[in-house]
Design a protein with these regions (language model features):
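N-terminal leader/linker segments that initiate helical-solenoid repeat arrays
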Residues: 18-54, 207
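Structural marker of alpha-solenoid helical repeat scaffolds
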Residues: 48, 82, 116-120, 154, ...
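Helix-start (N-cap) detector for alpha-helical repeat units in TPR-like alpha-solenoids
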Residues: 53-54, 87-88, 121-125, 158-160, ...
């Protein structure tokens, strides 16, 4: 009898402990690069609360970082049926479309994001960077220069953005400004081979 009671107590304590364990934080998982795990948690949260926009945002961020672009596009569209003006959803939907090669749609969404996001928005620099890449794809190099220049003004410590800014300027024939951008990229990251080659090209053209 005593053994049976003891067994029941142990089972009860184990059950209580299991239910008491908090679910992993999807945002923390995302920030730690555990995208697949974050996706699973977000999917569970959305099943429990289909109106949970925060879960949709983390889900879509994780899908994009996990290179599941088509699914990110689909899920962000679902979320925007619930809240069409959430700037986080607008921006990540634009990213998904960018990676799917849907340049016009992505550009329109990035522009819409920038028109509506507060001045302290965390993805402003990224939006301008992606716009610059779209303009490069479209061979609109002056537009690309403007976008990349705004991106590096917003976040001046990203060496790759300076490299792309240098490339856009190089393609417009603005070699002095291209040299400045490539040099800044190398200053931030001395092993940036694209920036090193870019600087060599424009230095040769300036001779």
């Amino acid at each position: 009898m005593k053994k049976s009671i003891l067994t029941l107590i142990i089972i009860s304590l184990f059950t209580i402990q299991s239910f008491a364990q908090p679910r992993a934080d999807a945002l923390v998982l995302y920030r730690n690069g555990k995208y697949a795990e974050a996706i699973k948690i977000c999917e569970q949260e959305i099943v429990e609360d289909p109106q949970n926009i925060d879960s949709y945002c983390v889900l879509c961020w994780s899908l994009v970082r996990n290179r599941q672009y088509a699914e990110a596009e689909q899920r962000s569209a679902e979320a925007r049926k619930i809240n069409s003006t959430d700037v986080r959803l607008i921006e990540i939907q634009a990213e998904a479309k960018f990676y799917l090669g849907k340049n016009t749609a992505a550009l329109e969404l990035f522009q819409y994001y920038l028109a509506n996001v507060p001045a302290n928005g965390s993805r402003i620099g990224n939006a301008y960077y992606y716009m610059g890449e779209i303009y490069i794809r479209q061979a609109k190099y002056q537009h690309a220069d403007i976008s990349f220049s705004t991106a590096v003004h917003t976040e001046p410590l990203v060496d790759y953005w300076w490299t792309r800014c240098g490339y856009a300027r190089e393609m417009t024939g603005n070699y002095n400004s291209a040299l400045e951008a490539y040099s800044k990229a190398i200053e931030l990251n001395g092993s940036n081979s694209d920036a090193i080659r870019g600087r060599e090209r424009v230095v040769a053209k300036l001779r």
